[in-house]
Amino acid sequence: MSTSPAGPWPAPAARGPLEATVALPGSKSLTARALLLAAVAEGPTTLAGVLRSRDTDLMEAALTALGARFEQLDGEAARLRARPAPLPLRVEAGPDGVGHVDVGLAGTVMRFVPPLAALADAPVVFDGDEAARARPLGPLLDALAELGAEVACLGEPGRLPVRVGPGDGALMRPADPAHPGRPHRVSVDASGSSQFLSALLLAAPLLPGGLAVTAVGRVPSLPHVAMTVAALRERGIAVDEPEEPVGPDAGCGGGRTWTVRPGRPAGGR
């Protein structure tokens, strides 16, 4: 059976000048970062201008699976009250003692949330749409394993599904017990995606002493890394940018009200 293709869509035409005020939704990229940072802040946070989409709904669900709580305010889907999860993050585990997160096709969920699972009280299995299984994840997983997290690929190496857990809890201890202020250190090949670098930066404030990250290779989408750094700084988190490593100081900003600004579509990076 065959069907003929649909004809052109008859777009409506105005009969005269239009005057209106349009409230633009927040940027998907900024919404993802705002949700994550609110989920691990030092106190409750109010978010305004939140973009509602499948990707951001999946991010909210993933963070809820790690202990954060989100409440819609005033009946507005774009306004949320976030209550952060304490460390170690409390996984909503099943009978097998493992949590499960559906990343869908959201690159921000599949890359930003696994570092948080390394700071949780139980392992988490990440999986998503069939197309998501074709997207690279290996460099981030390698970096997490280097930092001491438990990492296991349950299918093709460097691809979803993967299990990430705290291992022996190395990331929740100082990198150098004799010098508690010294940061953890790691290198990541971010040439395949700037999200690998952003993922580590977003988790960095939660590590005792912070994290110094060295990006290996040419990083694409540098504006999205700058977006991540700006989001951290706006919340009072110190970020140093020397020639090589990039490392936020430990300590996540306290809760307050944040408005997610509109932005141009950028693939949810």
What does each of the following model-derived ranges do?
Residues 1-269:
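Structural preference for solvent-exposed beta-strand-turn elements
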